[in-house]
Swiss-Prot record:
Protein name per UniProt: S-adenosylmethionine synthase
Keywords attached to this entry: ATP-binding, Cobalt, Cytoplasm, Magnesium, Metal-binding, Nucleotide-binding, One-carbon metabolism, Potassium, Transferase
Pathway info: Amino-acid biosynthesis; S-adenosyl-L-methionine biosynthesis; S-adenosyl-L-methionine from L-methionine: step 1/1
GO MF term set: ATP binding; metal ion binding; methionine adenosyltransferase activity
SUPFAM superfamilies, per the entry: S-adenosylmethionine synthetase (SSF55973)
Co-factor note (free text): Binds 2 divalent ions per subunit. The metal ions interact primarily with the substrate. Can utilize magnesium, manganese or cobalt (in vitro).
Named cofactor requirement(s): Mn(2+); Mg(2+); Co(2+); K(+)
Similarity comment: family membership: Belongs to the AdoMet synthase family.
Function noted in UniProt: Catalyzes the formation of S-adenosylmethionine from methionine and ATP. The reaction comprises two steps that are both catalyzed by the same enzyme: formation of S-adenosylmethionine (AdoMet) and triphosphate, and subsequent hydrolysis of the triphosphate.
PROSITE patterns, sorted: ADOMET_SYNTHASE_1, ADOMET_SYNTHASE_2
Quaternary structure and interacting proteins, as annotated: Homotetramer.
Binding site for L-methionine: 59, 102, 249, 280
UniProt binding sites for K(+): 46
Organism: Dendrobium crumenatum (Tropical pigeon orchid)
């Protein structure tokens, strides 16, 4: 039998104690708090952090009465930043707040001062967004991304439940998968490399770190069928990672947009998600095209699919919609495009209603760590597959 042609593809993730992800979570915690009291809140909240300091800044127009400083401290504390030696002390760090109202120019262009009906609300900005889906995992997400993300989530789990008490909040993961291309569809064959770098306390040895990570993090996450004697493990390869969180590196909202989406697969229009209300198409547009791409694959129209949508500020209708199934479509892409346009409303006001995106609570903070897509949680409304009617070609 001829040797199968394979290739390697790598995705990375960071867990909730990474300084950039800390900032994403604070931005979304503030969005949640605003939406909970005032579903029409307009929020563009950025966060940055460095040693002993968190700053939030941006534009928020809301009727909600929100204690920004309390939300910042509560979010840091929940992640595990409770003392200087782990990288940040939630109760004693400096919290700076510089929040203004949304520009009236933007407000009148997008919302017409709230006189517009939902279908008339214009996009909050220009831009283009991509949604992607692939049949290689039950989540219809890329395996390299799913494994990197789940390793990061598991790292946090064993820290918080006390299984590995030496763990500290900051950590990064990376997974290389060997794939073969099956007529445009991606088929994972094995895991080639697993890399974990996690913050740890002073007491633990590198051998203990490696043993614990293999037993309590990798084993429960990576399915046995993908591991073999040739799989490479890099476990804390730098040798020492005691200083971490905002003390180790500065953090900023919107710096982890590939981790938030598809791990380098598909494509990305460049817009970040966290801290943005649903009139910002960077977020709502990306959510609706994920639902479209996922529905195409789940309905058997294709094994792999990418959907692009684009917008102009103040204009409700998208400027373009694009579909590519990488040659895996059961019917031509132009017919799939027609089905997508008939079944999905890409106008921002309608996306907000159809995906129920004005609901706050603890909804968006959940998206701000471990990925916005492929999650099994009723709050992730864009993961709900829409049934699509299509005529299967005669055999």
């Amino acid at each position: 039998m001829a040797e199968v042609d394979t290739f390697l593809f790598t995705s990375e993730s960071v867990n909730e104690g990474h300084p950039d992800k800390l900032c994403d979570q604070i931005s979304d915690a503030i969005l949640d708090a605003c939406l909970e009291q005032d579903p029409d809140s307009k929020v563009a909240c950025e966060t940055c952090s460095k040693t002993n300091m968190v700053m939030i800044f941006g534009e928020i127009t809301t009727k909600a009465n929100v204690d920004y400083e309390k939300i910042v401290r509560d979010t840091c504390r929940a992640i595990g930043f409770v003392s200087d030696d782990v990288g940040l002390d939630a109760d004693n760090c400096k919290v700076l707040v510089n929040i203004e109202q949304q520009s009236p120019d933007i407000a009148q262009g997008v919302h017409g001062h709230f006189t517009k009906r939902p279908e008339e609300i214009g996009a909050g900005d220009q831009g283009h967004m991509f949604g992607y889906a692939t049949d290689e995992t039950p989540e219809l997400m890329p395996l390299s991304h799913v494994l990197a993300t789940k390793l990061g989530a598991r790292l946090t789990e064993v820290r918080k439940n006390g299984t590995c008490p030496w763990l500290r909040p900051d950590g990064k993961t990376q997974v290389t998968v060997e794939y073969r291309n099956d007529g445009g569809a991606m088929v994972p064959i094995r895991v080639h490399t697993v890399l974990i770098s996690t913050q740890h306390d002073e007491t633990v040895t590198n051998d203990e770190i490696a043993a614990d990570l293999k037993e309590h993090v990798i084993k429960p996450v990576v399915p046995e069928q993908y591991l073999d004697e040739k799989t490479i493990f890099h476990l804390n390869p730098s040798g020492r990672f005691v200083i971490g969180g905002p003390h180790g590196d500065a953090g900023l909202t919107g710096r982890k947009i590939i981790i938030d989406t598809y791990g380098g697969w598909g494509a990305h229009g460049g817009g970040a998600f966290s801290g943005k209300d649903p009139t910002k198409v960077d977020r709502s547009g990306a959510y609706i095209v994920r639902q479209a791409a996922k529905s195409v694959v789940a309905n058997g129209l294709a094994r792999r699919c990418i959907v692009q949508v684009s917008y102009a500020i103040g204009v409700p209708e998208p400027l373009s919609v694009f579909v590519d199934t990488y040659g895996t479509g059961k019917i031509p892409d132009k017919e799939i495009l027609k089905i997508v346009k008939e079944n999905f409303d890409f106008r921002p006001g309608m996306i907000t209603i159809n995906l129920d995106l004005k609901r706050g609570g603890n909804r968006f903070i959940k998206t701000a760590a471990y990925g916005h897509f492929g999650r099994d949680d009723p709050d992730f409304t864009w993961e709900v597959v829409k049934p699509l009617k299509w005529d299967k070609p005669a055999a």
